[in-house]
Amino acid sequence: MTPRMGGKLLILTWASTAFTLLGSHAVAQEPRPGVDWPQFRGVSAGGVAEGFEAPVRWNAETGENILWKTPIPGLGHSSPIVWGDLVCVTTADSGQADELKVGLYGDIEPVANDWPQRWEVRCLDKTTGAERWTAVAHQGVAGISRHPKATHANSTLATDGSHLVAMFGSEGLYAYDLETGRELWTVDLGLLESGFFRVPAALWGFAASPIISDDLVVIQADVLNGSFLAVFDVATGDERWRVDRDDVPTWSTPTVHDVDGRAQIVVNGFRHIGGYDLATGEERWRMRGGGDIPTPTPVVADGLIFITNSHGGEAPIFAINEGASGDITPAPGTLSNDHLVWSQRRDGAYMQTPLVYDNLLYNCRTNGVLSVYETRTGRRLYQQRIDGGGSGFTASPIAADGKVYFSSEDGSVYVLKVGPELEVLAENPMGETLMATPALSEGVMYIRTRGHLVAVG
């Protein structure tokens, strides 16, 4: 595809001239390892925060090892992010007792939610849980319906230490000053119909999160009509480029990594997995996917790009060379080629983003069956169920201090010892539904449940 540079854009507040007059040219900062968790799954979506002792046992029902617990109104599956002394989430609050149906089931009928919502960004003091600021991004009836297991605030925030970016799908893209909550700009992206392409009436809600890299905001919007990948200036909201994508709706957040000194965006997909040059939008490589509802985020580690998806009869895991180029789709009946180091056709994840930790790839299915592979060879070391069955697993794993954390939808957090065999160190109850991926900062875990943000330490 040929990128369209500087595409049409609606800036509703704080135009670029206002930035100049107010002296508001904020400077992006580098995240501090183990301290800052700036986007979905932390730095580069890796999900790892080293350098601090991490918790093993806690109980949110009794208060054991709970530092604070702050109510968050409304519904939201966006994961917490952490920067400096702030921890931030989004929510969509209707003021009603909104339905949320979790667990393992196959119902695809959407929830309409015809009553008005308030789309909010909430930032708390990470030490005390006290509110620092709340911004109302949008008010009104949602542009599209949602899946009964989803919300109208699924996308996780992203920050560069100065700007905070929120993506609310059809309700818009927003940027705030991280410290004050002052709205900087907003972009109307139009109606983004995120739904199952085989049943177009099943609109499930937008979920891909923004990411920030090199002063650019990256948005992947694979939807029923007019899928695209676009980048925006983080300071002004100006669109830098946009490329059309020939793909069906996906719910995956992209990843950015460097290849030979150039930043590259990597995207998951059904018809089109691929890499794009961050600066220009030029396509660098591509391949066809497998599962027809791609959700996991690509992960780059150990010189490889790991991509998985599942649904519709296929469930692949791909391990791709960082420097891949051209069309790398494997020939029929093969599992590797010059760019595809290894692949597995039947073990992919539907919802969870995989985790690479200590040269091991952790890949968990929605039913709680965990498979662990050697990253370089693709040799599977074990495949076992984490729990006794019955609960779904949607939140993605994170890791720290030799431990890997898996969260179930019924509100249990399982702590595993890293290694070639399954060893469960603890099962910790949260007392509420748990769909969002936790965050880690300075040895404290921040867990977003249905009704609260909880600090564990």
What residue ranges belong to the model's regions?
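N-terminal secretory signal peptides that target proteins for export/translocation
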Residues: 1-8
